[in-house]
Amino acid sequence: MGVKKEKGRKRFRKRKTYGNQILPLELLIEKNKREIINSAELMEEIYMKIDEKHTQCVTKYKKTR
């Protein structure tokens, strides 16, 4: 009978990464509605981001005119 060969550490397969996919703000809000509603800080952050987006859109619109 032969001697059993000791197996090395089993390596897991890496998951495929599709770059740094960032979910759109609206989707994130939909997914985490309960948490957001319960947390005033998160609500403030979201309103700030929406305001920033709005000001960016307005400035882009003015530049194209």
Swiss-Prot record:
Q: Which domain of life is it from?
A: Bacteria
Report whether Transmembrane helix shows up as a keyword of the record.
no
Enumerate the Pfam families for this protein: Fur_reg_FbpB
Residues annotated to bind DNA: 11-31
The reply on keyword Phosphoprotein is no
**Which GO molecular function terms does the record list?**
DNA binding
Keywords assigned: DNA-binding, Transcription, Transcription regulation
Q: What does the protein in this record do?
A: Regulates the expression of extracellular-protein genes of Bacillus subtilis.
Q: Which family does it belong to?
A: To B.natto SenN.
Q: What is this protein called?
A: Transcriptional regulatory protein SenS
What is the organism of origin for this protein? Bacillus subtilis (strain 168)
